[in-house]
């Protein structure tokens, strides 16, 4: 019983490693232009999230000050 469980686990690991190898074979290093574009989009997303957090934070802070005089 334990031997079959071990074989199942090893087969699962072997399949996973095979899939990882397939992905690595088709992937490539991004070009400089792709890297710059990805960096810009990521930076814009981070700034947008920060702005949304700030917009939520400011009214809540003022409402707390109005409620607890």
UniProtKB/Swiss-Prot annotation:
One of its GO terms (cellular component) is plasma membrane. Its main location: membrane. It comes from the Archaea. InterPro entries: Prot_translocase_SecE_dom_sf (IPR023391), Translocase_Sec61-g (IPR008158), Translocase_SecE/Sec61-g (IPR001901). GO terms for biological process: intracellular protein transmembrane transport; protein secretion; protein targeting. Keywords: Cell membrane, Membrane, Protein transport, Translocation, Transmembrane, Transmembrane helix, Transport. Belongs to the SecE/SEC61-gamma family. Essential subunit of the Sec protein translocation channel SecYEG. Clamps together the 2 halves of SecY. May contact the channel plug during translocation. Component of the Sec protein translocase complex. Heterotrimer consisting of SecY (alpha), SecG (beta) and SecE (gamma) subunits. The heterotrimers can form oligomers, although 1 heterotrimer is thought to be able to translocate proteins. Interacts with the ribosome. May interact with SecDF, and other proteins may be involved. This is Protein translocase subunit SecE. It comes from Methanococcus maripaludis (strain DSM 14266 / JCM 13030 / NBRC 101832 / S2 / LL). The gene is secE.
């Amino acid at each position: 019983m334990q031997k079959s469980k071990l074989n199942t686990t090893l087969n699962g690991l072997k399949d996973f490693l095979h899939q990882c190898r397939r992905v690595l074979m088709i992937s490539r290093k991004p070009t400089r232009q792709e890297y710059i574009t990805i960096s810009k989009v990521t930076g814009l997303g981070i700034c947008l999230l920060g702005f949304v957090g700030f917009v939520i934070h400011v009214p809540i802070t003022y409402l707390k000050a109005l409620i607890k005089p």
